[in-house]
């Protein structure tokens, strides 16, 4: 069993254990599609085994393949697309983001690496070894000054600094930021999704196994728990912050939690849990206009070369 497959199995088992803890929720679940001129579901290549998604302002979307590192690029308005980055040995694609310079940053899972591609051509631009030991590089967010990567097995974030005009750094400039403060490492899958707030001055992370949310000071690594009034987002995977509204995908729960954050990010309230009959272990989330798009990773379905995979659109208003 390959390291990446072992990690995914661990993730699935960990999430299943957490199902009971998250079954009782105060906020009601709802299901809704909108904008009938946009596809409700987008078909990905059979056998693709997707995980992460990124969408640009023009509706171009990117979805990565866990076991091969391939990236599928398409248009959310038509639902059509093609493979932009071919898979290759020694690569993986978990979370991904596109920056303002048209570059695709990809978290490399159990490879311990980060990969950067030209988003338009798919041409490799750089790769970075983030971790030397056992790790799982799970998600990424790109600010004006750095790309930040999470590690689900270690209490650390990795910083890939960007130059004044967005220039990519050398390997020796990549640093690790130890997490301190309220965050405590637990057994299983820890830090997963990440986003930034306040123009990159604060980072927000979710801890999958505990369902807790934290802010992170990117200068010091100090974490502060976001008080949800006793609620949690167990099985939290990808996250998306729009203004003061935070969306958290709860993968094996087949839910997306919508959380209204206080202006200082110290507390928030779960206002609803979005469900959809088309959800099948959704993992990550991105938006286009008022629409949310989630990737069905289907972790509970044994993957085969003919297993179908989809991206599902739901109302994000």
State the predicted function of each range.
Residues 61-68, 98-99, 104-111, 148-153, ...:
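Conserved beta-strand positions in repeat-built beta-propeller and related beta-rich domains
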Residues 75-79, 118-123, 161-166, 217-221, ...:
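Short loop/turn segments that connect beta-strands within beta-propeller blades
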Residues 112-146, 150, 154-156, 179-180:
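Asp-box/WD-like beta-propeller blade repeats and closely related beta-sheet repeat scaffolds
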Residues 45-61, 88-104, 131-148, 181-203, ...:
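Beta-rich, blade/repeat-based domains predominating
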Residues 37-44, 79-87, 123-129, 175-186, ...:
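A short beta-strand motif characteristic of beta-propeller blades
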Residues 79-115, 124-131:
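Blade-loop segments of beta-propeller domains
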């Amino acid at each position: 069993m390959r390291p990446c497959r072992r990690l995914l199995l661990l993730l699935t088992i960990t999430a299943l254990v957490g199902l009971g803890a998250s079954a009782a929720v105060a906020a009601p679940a709802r299901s809704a599609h909108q904008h009938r001129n946009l596809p409700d579901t987008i078909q990905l290549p059979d056998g693709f085994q997707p995980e992460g998604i990124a969408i640009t302002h023009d509706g171009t979307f990117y979805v990565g393949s866990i076991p091969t590192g391939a990236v599928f690029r398409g248009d959310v308005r038509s639902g059509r697309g093609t493979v932009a980055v071919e898979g290759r040995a020694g690569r993986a694609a978990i979370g991904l983001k596109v920056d303002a310079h048209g570059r695709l940053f990809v978290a490399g899972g159990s490879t311990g690496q980060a990969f950067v591609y030209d988003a338009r051509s798919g041409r490799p631009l750089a790769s970075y070894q983030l971790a030397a030991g056992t790790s799982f590089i799970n998600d990424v967010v790109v600010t004006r000054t750095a790309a930040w990567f999470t590690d689900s097995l270690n209490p650390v974030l990795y910083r890939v600094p960007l130059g004044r005009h967005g220039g990519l750094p050398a390997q020796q400039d990549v640093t690790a930021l130890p997490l301190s403060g309220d965050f405590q490492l637990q057994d299983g899958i820890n830090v997963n999704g990440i986003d930034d707030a306040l123009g990159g001055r604060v980072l927000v992370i979710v801890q999958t196994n505990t369902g807790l949310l934290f802010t992170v000071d990117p200068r010091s690594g100090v974490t502060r728990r976001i008080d949800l009034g006793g609620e949690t987002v167990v099985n939290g995977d990808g996250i998306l912050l729009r203004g003061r509204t935070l969306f958290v995908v709860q993968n094996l729960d087949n839910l997306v939690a919508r959380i209204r954050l206080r202006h200082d990010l110290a507390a928030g309230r779960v206002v609803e849990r979005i469900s959809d009959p088309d959800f099948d272990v959704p993992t990550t989330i991105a938006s286009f206009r008022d629409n949310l798009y989630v990737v069905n990773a289907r972790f509970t379905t044994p993957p085969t070369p003919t297993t179908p995979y989809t991206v599902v659109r739901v109302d994000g208003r």
